[in-house]
Every structure is written in structure tokens, then in C-alpha cells.
Curated annotation (Swiss-Prot):
Region annotation G1: where it falls in the sequence: 12-19
Job description of the protein: An essential GTPase that binds both GDP and GTP, with rapid nucleotide exchange. Plays a role in 16S rRNA processing and 30S ribosomal subunit biogenesis and possibly also in cell cycle regulation and energy metabolism.
Highest taxon of the lineage: Bacteria
Listed name of the protein: GTPase Era
Protein's gene: era
Topological relation to the membrane, as annotated: Peripheral membrane protein
Length: 300
């Protein structure tokens, strides 16, 4: 079937609402949301499809200075997203002041030579008046010319349809095949791992979360019983973090497991049996083999 087709990269510094935006577009939870930076590790690809369009949305990790091999992976994911994109959404949140991170991303956009760049003003409801939003747009327009500016509230799903219709103006017509759809389907293991990691980010102390990875050890689905048995391991960098993750009498690991299980049940609409273990891999973010085993690609 011929439809308007294209790839849209959602970019911006950490915690400006990129994950909330893609979740609002898809009307389901596909990208983890937390008040801590680096909560989106992979460039998550999700397909939006309606009667006349098929759009791949790529939710990128936030750009930041690399301090280990995992950080290099994160920044590489951003570069790939820019290269593939037909349209770039630059997200600027009204609850955050402009910073050097914003302008570094703008420079990356300019280096990519992409013409179809849309400024998305997120959390527009936070601004006390329209003048503050206009001033933000004016500041950013000094550095890059945007094709359009859309004010949204992703949390309250305001102007999301307007944004989608604006994006469609910059798409080309192409044949959409089953292969195209299959190509962008995320692996279940990735969704499960990110769901567990979100609960780690939400519940653990600040010194632990970004040294946390999640490995899916076993995944068996019984279609007849609509029952999914999952065994996973939370990977941490230091032995001293293990008691924190497990908690007193196992209280913390139980809390993480119960919350993740509830979330997975809502996503997959099936009975979930989830068992989580804790493993220590010293400095795993510096170990290529471990980083790759957790599903992250390393830039050579």
C-alpha cells in the first residue's frame, strides 16, 4: 500500500519530555520515563500508522559527554538517528532553561544538513504566559531556522494530532510492506529489560541507577495459557550496591519486581511470572563484551 512514509528523530537534552512525547504519539508506554537523566539508552524505534501514513519515530538518548563505553554507544545512537531521519523534532521544555546541551544538539542538527526541523515546545502549560514561549522560540531561531513550531503538552496529549499532521507535510509517498513493519518491531527482551530498568531508576538511590543494566536470562510464553515466564538479572557494578538493590529482607527487589510485573501485564495483557536476580559485573560499562551482551552496539 502506498502511504506517506518517513523517519522522524526526536532529539533534545535529557529530561525535556522526549519519552513522554513518543508515548503520547503511540498512546502506549514504549519508552521509559524517569526524573533522572540517561533513562533512554537505545534509540527506540516505534511505528505510527494511520490510513494515509506510516511514520517511524526514533526516541534518542540524551546527548552528554562520554565517560565510558556505554556513553559512547549513547552518543553514537544519536548520530545514527540524525543520519536516518527525514524529519527532526527538536524538543525544548519550558520547565528548563536553555543550556550548552541545547546548543550542542543544535550544532549536530546543523552538521546533519537536515532541512525539515520542527521545534517542539514541550510542557507549554508551565509557561506563565505566551510571551515566555515566544522569547524561547526567538532565542532558538537565532541559531537555527525551524520549518514549524508546535507547542504541546505530551502529558495531557494536547496538540499531538497537530504535530503529527505537521510532520506529514514533510514525508514522501512510498510502498509500506510487511517487511517494513517487522523491521521496526522492538524485541520483547528489550521492552522487558527497559521496564525493569525503569523501576530501578525510580526506586534506587542516586549512586546506583546508571550503573544498572538488565539481562533477560529466560523468556517463555505459553500461548494456550496466556502466561509469560521471565527470568532476568539486574547487573550492577559494585558489590556495595547489592544490598541496596536487594533491600532489607529482599524488600527492594520485591518492590521492583512487582512494579515491573504490573507494567508488563498492562503492556502485553497476559499473566506475567517475573523472577529477578542481582549480578555484580565490576565496571561493566567499560567492558565491551558485557555492554554488547546487554543489547548495546559499540561504535568501532
Amino acid at each position: 500500500m502506498v502511504k506517506k512514509y518517513g523517519i522522524v528523530a526526536i532529539v533534545g537534552k535529557p529530561n525535556v519530555g522526549k519519552s513522554t512525547l513518543i508515548n503520547a504519539i503511540m498512546r502506549k508506554k514504549v519508552s521509559i520515563i524517569s526524573n533522572k537523566p540517561q533513562t533512554t539508552r537505545n534509540a527506540i524505534k516505534e511505528i505510527y500508522e494511520d490510513d494515509d501514513s506510516a511514520i517511524i519515530f526514533t526516541d534518542t538518548p540524551g546527548f552528554h559527554e562520554p565517560s565510558n563505553k556505554l556513553d559512547l554507544f549513547l552518543n553514537h545512537e544519536i548520530e545514527v538517528s540524525y543520519k536516518e531521519a527525514n524529519v527532526i523534532l527538536f524538543v525544548s521544555s519550558m520547565d528548563k532553561e536553555l543550556s550548552e546541551d541545547d546548543f550542542e544538539i543544535i550544532n549536530l542538527i546543523k552538521e546533519s544538513n537536515k532541512e525539515n526541523v520542527i521545534l517542539v515546545i514541550s510542557k507549554a502549560e508551565v509557561a506563565k504566559n505566551q510571551d515566555k514561549i515566544d522569547e524561547r522560540v526567538h532565542q532558538l531561531n537565532k541559531y537555527i531556522q525551524f520549518k514549524d513550531v508546535i507547542q504541546i503538552s505530551a502529558l495531557h496529549v494536547i496538540n499531538i494530532d497537530k504535530l503529527i499532521n505537521t510532520i506529514k507535510q514533510y514525508l514522501h509517498k512510498d510502498v509500506v510492506t510487511d517487511y517494513f513493519r517487522q523491521k521496526v518491531e522492538k524485541e520483547d527482551k528489550f521492552i522487558i529489560a527497559e521496564t525493569i530498568r525503569e523501576q530501578c531508576l525510580l526506586n534506587l538511590n542516586h549512586e546506583v541507577p546508571h550503573g544498572v543494566g538488565v539481562e533477560i536470562d529466560e523468556s517463555k510464553y505459553n500461548q494456550e495459557a496466556n502466561h509469560w515466564i521471565i527470568k532476568a538479572s539486574i547487573i550492577i557494578e559494585k558489590n556495595s550496591h547489592k544490598p541496596i538493590v536487594i533491600g532489607q529482607n529482599g524488600a527492594m527487589i520485591k518492590k521492583i519486581s512487582m512494579a515491573a510485573r504490573k507494567q508488563l501485564h498492562e503492556i502485553y495483557d497476559c499473566h506475567i511470572s517475573l523472577t529477578i536476580f542481582v549480578k555484580v559485573e565490576n565496571n561493566w560499562r567499560e567492558n565491551n563484551n558485557v555492554v554488547k551482551s546487554l543489547g548495546y552496539k559499540i561504535k568501532k
